[in-house]
């Protein structure tokens, strides 16, 4: 299959290599021509995925429209807040018959839209049955080394989800399917915010009790928002829900947990972000999800606390005190 992977960060590069090794005809798009030339010359992404050699068959290109026209499947692996701008670059092309697989996890700031909603809004010729999401506990650092990983391909069309499953599945990259793309995208977006909270807990020096509470009550927030927006509760107990939440809150590879940890140690958000060469999606998602939760009337206290610490400069100690001294309630609330 002809597959275009849009976005040459760590995850886009990892998936491009995985698909090329499987025998697909894969072309990886890099936004900046000079970066594309460097990738092609070095046959390795030394900036975002050092040490992973490109298969000879993997081609690199900065030319978006010819790539999209050539492709049968388009994998969008750009940061969530850059998705709209990227796909506007080919919104006039005929996309009939093509499958679009989004792998970026986030909610768009300003609109509150999930990534599949952005795709459908910007690409008027695309129908929901052409769009899928590939989410789950899948750090690029481990997938690129061939370590066992499981994810879920989700689409409103089971046939589309199963096609994505067939295309991506390998002996070490197991792909499940479901049709709850709403639940999958909500879970995959909110978990990054909860991971920032978990990192803050680590940075302060709190113990396992606090971490367990953050993960568990974070799951409750994900579940409430998911249900409000039409997702299915069972999705939250799957790979895109608890699976991705656990790995993002605990892993040393988690950029979102790292941001939180540094905030917990007293550093400013600007200082932390300026020293990172990759995106921590939870920073943007905390603003977008906080605004979305207010718009739809869903109480998300951990999300609110993270937003306040990141963007309103609320002291970490005060945010924690406010969380712990809220009105008492039943666990299911």
UniProtKB/Swiss-Prot annotation:
GO biological process, alphabetically ordered: carbohydrate metabolic process; glycerol-3-phosphate biosynthetic process; glycerol-3-phosphate catabolic process; glycerophospholipid metabolic process; phospholipid biosynthetic process
Molecular-function annotations in GO: glycerol-3-phosphate dehydrogenase [NAD(P)+] activity; NAD binding
Gene3D superfamilies hit by this protein: N-(1-d-carboxylethyl)-l-norvaline Dehydrogenase, domain 2 (1.10.1040.10), NAD(P)-binding Rossmann-like Domain (3.40.50.720)
Domain of life: Bacteria
Subcellular location field: Cytoplasm
Source lineage: Bacteria, Pseudomonadati, Chlorobiota, Chlorobiia, Chlorobiales
Source organism: Pelodictyon phaeoclathratiforme (strain DSM 5477 / BU-1)
Catalytic class of the enzyme: oxidoreductase
GO cellular component: cytosol
Active site residues according to the UniProt entry: 191
Annotated catalysed reactions: sn-glycerol 3-phosphate + NAD(+) = dihydroxyacetone phosphate + NADH + H(+); sn-glycerol 3-phosphate + NADP(+) = dihydroxyacetone phosphate + NADPH + H(+)
Alphabetically ordered keywords of this record: Cytoplasm, Lipid biosynthesis, Lipid metabolism, NAD, NADP, Nucleotide-binding, Oxidoreductase, Phospholipid biosynthesis, Phospholipid metabolism
Residue numbers binding NADPH: 10-11, 31-32, 105, 140, 255, 279, 281
Name the UniProt record assigns to this protein: Glycerol-3-phosphate dehydrogenase [NAD(P)+]
Chief location category: cytoplasm
Residues noted as binding sn-glycerol 3-phosphate in the record, renumbered to the chain: 105, 136, 138, 191, 244, 254-256
Pathway annotation from the record: Membrane lipid metabolism; glycerophospholipid metabolism
General function of this protein: Catalyzes the reduction of the glycolytic intermediate dihydroxyacetone phosphate (DHAP) to sn-glycerol 3-phosphate (G3P), the key precursor for phospholipid synthesis.
EC number, as in UniProt: 1.1.1.94
Matching NCBIfam families: PRK00094.1-2 (NF000940), PRK00094.1-3 (NF000941), PRK00094.1-4 (NF000942)
């Amino acid at each position: 299959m002809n597959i275009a992977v849009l976005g040459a960060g760590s995850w886009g590069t990892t998936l491009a290599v995985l698909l090329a090794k499987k025998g697909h005809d894969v072309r990886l798009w890099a936004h900046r021509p000079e970066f594309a030339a460097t990738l092609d010359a070095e046959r390795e992404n030394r900036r975002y995925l050092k040490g992973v050699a490109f298969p000879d068959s993997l081609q690199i290109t900065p030319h978006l429209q010819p790539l999209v026209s050539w492709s049968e499947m388009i994998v969008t692996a750009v940061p969530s807040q850059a998705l709209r701008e990227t796909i506007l670059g080919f919104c006039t092309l005929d996309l009939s018959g093509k499958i679009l697989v989004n792998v970026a996890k986030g909610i768009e700031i300003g609109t509150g839209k999930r990534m599949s909603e952005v795709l459908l809004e910007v690409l008027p010729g695309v129908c929901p049955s052409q769009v899928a999401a590939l989410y789950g506990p899948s750090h690029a650092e481990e997938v690129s080394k061939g370590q066992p990983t499981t994810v879920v391909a989700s689409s409103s069309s089971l046939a589309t989800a199963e096609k994505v499953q067939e295309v991506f599945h390998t002996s070490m990259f197991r792909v499940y399917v479901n049709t709850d793309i709403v639940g999958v995208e909500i879970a995959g977006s909110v978990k990054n915010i909860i991971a920032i909270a978990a990192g803050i807990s680590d940075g302060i020096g709190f113990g396992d009790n606090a971490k367990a509470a953050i993960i568990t009550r974070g799951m409750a927030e994900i579940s409430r928002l998911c249900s409000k927006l039409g997702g299915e509760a069972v999705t939250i107990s799957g790979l895109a829900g608890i699976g991705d939440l656990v790995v993002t809150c605990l892993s040393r590879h988690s950029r979102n947990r790292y941001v939180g940890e540094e905030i917990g140690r007293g550093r400013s958000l600007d200082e932390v972000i300026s020293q990172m060469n990759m995106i921590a999606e939870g920073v943007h998602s905390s603003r977008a999800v906080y605004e979305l939760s207010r718009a739809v009337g869903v109480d998300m206290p951990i999300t609110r606390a993270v937003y306040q610490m990141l963007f309103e400069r609320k002291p970490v100690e005060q945010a924690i005190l406010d969380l712990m001294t809220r009105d008492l309630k039943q666990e299911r609330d």
